[in-house]
């Protein structure tokens, strides 16, 4: 029974970290995009609608070329990733979906998945993005 309680605590901690991360990520994306790369690991990979971007410099260039955005998150889910699958690195899978407008234009539905890893600093633990997959979910006209 103690194992189940410990896992529940682990899940609760992961969800709190995910909620905090999502608030920071989308506020930074909308209002301070130049600072967004600080949330990524040095060798992080972004897949944006099938286009692969790897490394901080490439990420900074990619985010700089995107038009201004207004994200609204409608759904958030998270779960810890078992440490056997991540070489004992504390990792959380975060899944979001919602709507976004770029340059105030047409609203698009989107889905975004993040793999966050815990990075220890002398004073705290910081979550960094190892992998990020963004995809529009718009349906074609039927």
UniProtKB/Swiss-Prot annotation:
Gene Ontology BP annotations: mRNA transport; nucleocytoplasmic transport; protein transport
Compartments, record wording: Nucleus; Cytoplasm
PROSITE patterns: NTF2_DOMAIN
InterPro entries named in the record: NTF2 (IPR045875), NTF2-like_dom_sf (IPR032710), NTF2_dom (IPR002075), Nuclear_transport_factor_2_euk (IPR018222)
Keywords noted in UniProt: Cytoplasm, mRNA transport, Nucleus, Protein transport, Transport
Pfam families per UniProt: NTF2
UniProt-recorded name of the protein: NTF2-related export protein 2
Cellular component terms (Gene Ontology): cytoplasm; cytosol; nuclear RNA export factor complex; nucleoplasm; nucleus; perinuclear region of cytoplasm
Subunit structure: Associates with NXF1, NXF2, NXF3 and NXF5.
Residue ranges occupied by any NTF2 domain in the UniProt entry: 17-136
Function of the molecule: Regulator of protein export for NES-containing proteins. Also plays a role in mRNA nuclear export.
């Amino acid at each position: 029974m103690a194992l189940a309680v410990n896992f529940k605590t682990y899940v609760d901690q992961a969800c709190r970290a995910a909620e905090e991360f999502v608030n920071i990520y989308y506020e930074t994306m909308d209002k301070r995009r130049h600072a967004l790369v600080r949330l990524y690991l040095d060798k992080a990979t972004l897949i944006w609608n099938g286009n692969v971007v790897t490394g901080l410099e490439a990420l900074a260039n990619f985010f700089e070329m995107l038009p201004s955005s207004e994200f609204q998150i409608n759904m958030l889910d998270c779960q810890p990733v078992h440490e056997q699958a991540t070489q004992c690195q504390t990792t959380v899978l975060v899944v979001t979906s919602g709507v976004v407008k770029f340059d105030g234009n047409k609203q698009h539905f989107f889905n975004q998945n993040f793999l966050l890893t815990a990075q220890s600093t002398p004073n705290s633990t910081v979550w960094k993005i190892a992998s990020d997959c963004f995809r529009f979910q718009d349906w074609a006209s039927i």
